A protein has these predicted regions:
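Internal acidic/polar
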Residues: 3-6, 84, 91-122, 141
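Structural recognition of an alpha-helix C-terminal capping motif at a helix-to-coil junction
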Residues: 34, 48-55, 68-80
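Sigma70-family region 2
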Residues: 14-15, 54-69, 88-89
Length: 179
């Protein structure tokens, strides 16, 4: 049902239906924003890039082939947008901590743990990091990652396993479940 719904939304968006465009943005905005944030580390820049992703998506909607998933197409655009961002900037991403509006101690602790994990993920080699972000943070299935990155499923499994090993070493834990 999801696939047909997305297909219908894309068809309506191509026809100029603003409501369909809005539904597509609402459906995927959070995931694409998180993806950008995990690569850019700046919430304002990530928001700008997310908007750029959707602008690109809608301006090139006529090129979209409906045999793939909308989500994967958006992640592809997001990946290219992030790469272009760094090509223009030519800076190494800063290790600034994200500012949070959370005030309770629990939220601060959770944010601290998440930031520690994110910093460890940033240290992974690029190919492994990309796979890890899609798997652990975006919660894509291994098969979806393989399709998105145009690699074999066995390579995705290897990269996820390698990411777990490297993260355990970086975070100094003995079992991945401790993370």
């Amino acid at each position: 049902m999801k696939y047909k719904t997305n297909s219908l939304l894309v068809h309506l968006a191509r026809a100029g239906d603003e409501d369909a465009c809005e539904k597509l943005v609402k459906k995927y905005y959070s995931s694409i924003y998180q993806y950008c944030l995990l690569h850019i580390y700046d919430p304002y820049e990530a928001e700008d890039l997310t908007q750029e992703v959707f602008t690109c998506f809608f301006s090139n909607l006529y090129r979209y082939k409906e045999y793939g998933k909308v989500k994967n197409y958006l992640y592809t655009i997001a990946g290219n947008t992030v790469k272009n961002y760094y090509k223009k900037k030519k800076d190494i991403p800063s290790e600034e901590l994200l500012k949070s509006e959370y005030s309770s101690k629990n939220h601060v602790e959770e944010l601290g743990v998440r930031l520690t994990i994110e910093q460890a993920v940033r240290k992974l080699p690029e190919e492994i990091r990309e796979t890890a972000v899609l798997y652990f943070f975006q919660e894509l299935k291994q098969r979806e990652i393989a399709e998105l990155l145009h690699i074999k499923l066995s390579l995705v499994k290897y990269r996820i396993g390698r990411a777990k090993e490297l993260l355990m070493k970086e975070l100094e834990v003995k079992n991945y479940d401790e993370i």
